[in-house]
């Protein structure tokens, strides 16, 4: 208790250093804790799974096209997993653009079709009702979706009309797990509701202990035919992928972005690096300022050692003082986190709730940080000669060197973060301002067709009715004066597409992405034809012609379309006499997705019309409101509901760069925090250093030194430290930038102005911190100082 009081008394005597030290550490801890909470949330995705490392999905690879699927839907030359090794097995089907009808309202829904075994593998909290799918009509709603439909009414037992025309009954309301989840849905439907859904299912397995997963993967690596090779020679392989790994492989789920989240290891490494650098900045600042405060007690420690104080007592004093400071800083940091919770959640696009991890993290900081920060001061004073401690209070040259070393290390980190911040903001600007190579203005992606996802619900009559509704949509769109062009499809120009191998006239194999289109597609997006001509194809003429982009023409080994042709490898294997189909036109390259992914060699099978629920619509500039009103009325006329989903292409493109924007913003914010923390450290050190030099300054003034001379003298040491830190930070920043962006097809240049701006920014802010103290020192009264020193 006596030691605690002694420690508290010392901290109160050194109020300036205590406050500066506390604020610097609090800012550092607040930033680091925010980042660590986000990183922890990313690393614990899908922990609601009973065992995410040992629950596996089937990942199929069909000639270069990977995706999650199942084995039971392959009916030819396939293999099944031996049920003797299976502890539990379930399937799910994601239906991203589905809907239900409540009264007269059509409400978009992300539906997950599965069975009750799914809940044996994934634990969801039950808010109301029961967590089961006992009947084909059973349905479970998320708490948020139930509130959207029913408000404050009790939803249990309510009946909704599903898109296939069948009634479903709400039997339970599920809450959100504490962890982040890969699969996100609004409604869970029973797989018994239909036997023929719109898309294939994905199988999930939990195996019995001792099952050889490698042996199963080895068996799956053998190519097998999908269908009868007389007609279709495509093959597929399969492997098992754990639930834990699915999140980190976005290519498996990128066609349903509204239902599946994916992670980015590179992004997480960046955040981890920023977190580590900020924490290190705070710790260095803390140790440095604490050492400055201890320098005033060198004589005191020397006398204590003369009178027999042992090393344990000395360490206890230092450790308790650091613990009090760390505890205070930790409390302030959590206060900052709470105050900044709204902007933090906006920045990271997630809701942070308090979990056990927060408690463990705080306890770890409180236990470890005081020990870490006490080691160097303890070694310094425990092994310093008592005589040396008594004779000198902070005048040793090595003490000054260590202070400058710690300060320089802080500024190396600060310069590094500032340079990275400037670069990634420039990279973001380039991504947002670089034209993708196609028209982006005044184009909408609209879901106009709302039909059943249950294929078993269709009869001949219902199919005819569906065709009539789609024809009505097309006729009305053709008659609208505000609509220039439209293209029905299953995906828009940004949607990831599949591909396959094609052969050129030399029999060489080339993998090309496939994008089905009509002649209107190229006009709608203003994609320039650079060679040949895309013919007008009417509905009666069902032929398909091939168009390629420049990248595909080059990949195929052609320089012109003269004599150029392709054939799908699958077709050639099925019939060796199949001839090449000519390439009729070449179009300009464009970026189909994120600019950093580059331009993909693409082939366009061009036909009269391709069906799909998604309409890409180019409208007259300035007529956005009129077009939306027209489409709303059209939906009501065709489907009896004004509800429909739409986005604007410009917004979709901006959304692609959400993570890039987040990275740039994080660097900017935390680089600013690093400057503040380092400036606080500089302020604390200068308070001590400049005060120690008052006698020297007084003598220089007596000998005729001007204020300009004193400014130069006092600034010089700190300027030198900043310049050295900057010189060291330049190659580090350059290396990190080049390492991270080496695979980017489009990246901003690393120009010298980024480094110059960072140098000026840090120097101006940091030395501005010193201005008042140096001005005060330059105008001291020499007589008064000589009397008091």
Predicted regions located by residue number:
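Mid-to-C-terminal secondary-structure elements
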Residues: 115-127, 139-263, 475-655
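Alpha-helical transmembrane segments
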Residues: 27-56, 340-347, 413-442, 740-745
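Membrane-proximal extracellular/periplasmic loop immediately following the first transmembrane helix
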Residues: 35-98, 199-206, 217-221, 239-249, ...
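Membrane-helix entry/capping segments
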Residues: 2-4, 9, 13-14, 223-275, ...
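Hydrophobic alpha-helical bundles that form the membrane domains of multi-pass transporters
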Residues: 260-341, 345-346, 360
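Intracellular coupling helices
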Residues: 4-20, 24, 284-325, 383-393, ...
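Small-residue-rich transmembrane alpha-helices
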Residues: 30, 34, 288, 322-386, ...
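Hydrophobic alpha-helical transmembrane segments of multi-pass inner-membrane transport and secretion
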Residues: 13-40, 262-299, 327, 402-427, ...
